[in-house]
């Protein structure tokens, strides 16, 4: 995808960020459930709530810009979360 302006780059990066945060939302509940240490469980649960807030804010930004947040998948976060899921299975 050729980005021809700073505005298009900004929208692209916002979509990438939204995708990353949404992917985290899909995985964190399993990580919270799998955590055996109380402090880790609490930290992950707190991060889950913060991530929900991030997604909500990003969706408000997209709504105010009259753009859709969908249509892009953050490959970097996808890889990181795949590693995390593999650790949960071990």
Task: Please report, for each region that a protein language model flagged, where it lies by residue.
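Amphipathic alpha-helical hairpins
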Residues: 1-90
